[in-house]
From Swiss-Prot:
The gene is leuD. GO terms for molecular function: 3-isopropylmalate dehydratase activity. Catalyzes the isomerization between 2-isopropylmalate and 3-isopropylmalate, via the formation of 2-isopropylmaleate. The lineage of its organism: Bacteria, Pseudomonadati, Elusimicrobiota, Endomicrobiia, Endomicrobiales. This is 3-isopropylmalate dehydratase small subunit. Pfam families: Aconitase_C.
Length: 163
């Protein structure tokens, strides 16, 4: 399998970004990714949707995706154009939901500490290498097992099952 490479600008957040901040409950009357993406992160970053470009990357501190167990949160993030999320740690249900919908998430304390908002970052998902292009630094994260890489490359669990 060829390496999966992602590249984008960083949008950085702190600790305990919860699912209600990622996609507020008032928008949970739909599962349409396009609609959800319009409101992604609006309660903590009013300009998120306006500033995100396809391929961009979220970097956050601890316990990203905590709170309610809603699949809407990773769907909104992915549909907004974000290609991956890097954090010190993730809420476990958010971690599982992200993989299930094909949103790559990586844990790397060194990367989170060094990467700043607006930095250009390249991720080699296959090898678990996070490269800060802006600072010319690299950080190692745990690469996904081959099976999970196939799930992500297929766009999520449903895409993997269909392929």
């Amino acid at each position: 399998m060829s390496d999966i490479i992602l590249k984008g600008k960083v949008h950085k957040y702190g600790s305990n970004v919860n699912t209600d901040e990622i996609i507020p409950a008032r928008y949970l009357n739909t599962t349409d990714p396009t609609i959800l993406s319009k409101y992604c992160m609006e309660d903590i970053d009013k300009n998120f949707v306006k500033n995100v470009k396809a391929g961009d990357i979220i970097v956050a501190e601890n316990n990203f995706g905590c709170g309610s167990s809603r699949e809407h949160a990773p769907i909104a993030i992915k549909a907004s154009g974000i290609s991956a999320v890097i954090a010190n740690s993730f809420a476990r249900i958010f971690f599982r939901n992200s993989i299930n919908i094909g949103l790559p998430i990586l844990e790397s304390q060194k990367a989170v500490k060094a990467i700043e908002n607006g930095d250009a970052v390249e991720i080699n998902l296959t090898k678990g290498i996070i490269k800060n292009i802006t600072k010319n630094e690299s950080y190692q994260s745990q690469p996904f097992p081959e099976f999970m890489q196939k799930v992500i490359k297929s766009g999520g669990l449903l895409g993997y099952i269909k392929s």
